[in-house]
């Protein structure tokens, strides 16, 4: 699955 993690405004990391 995919999971999008937000660390701050305009910052995100998508983990496959």
From Swiss-Prot:
Keywords: Adaptive immunity, Cell membrane, Immunity, Membrane, Receptor, T cell receptor. It comes from the Eukaryota. The gene is TRBJ2-3. GO terms for cellular component: T cell receptor complex. It comes from Homo sapiens. This is T cell receptor beta joining 2-3. J region of the variable domain of T cell receptor (TR) beta chain that participates in the antigen recognition. Alpha-beta T cell receptors are antigen specific receptors which are essential to the immune response and are present on the cell surface of T lymphocytes. Recognize peptide-major histocompatibility (MH) (pMH) complexes that are displayed by antigen presenting cells (APC), a prerequisite for efficient T cell adaptive immunity against pathogens. It is found in: Cell membrane. The keyword Cell membrane applies. Its main location: membrane. Alpha-beta TR is a heterodimer composed of an alpha and beta chain; disulfide-linked. The alpha-beta TR is associated with the transmembrane signaling CD3 coreceptor proteins to form the TR-CD3 (TcR or TCR). The assembly of alpha-beta TR heterodimers with CD3 occurs in the endoplasmic reticulum where a single alpha-beta TR heterodimer associates with one CD3D-CD3E heterodimer, one CD3G-CD3E heterodimer and one CD247 homodimer forming a stable octameric structure. CD3D-CD3E and CD3G-CD3E heterodimers preferentially associate with TR alpha and TR beta chains, respectively. GO terms for biological process: adaptive immune response.
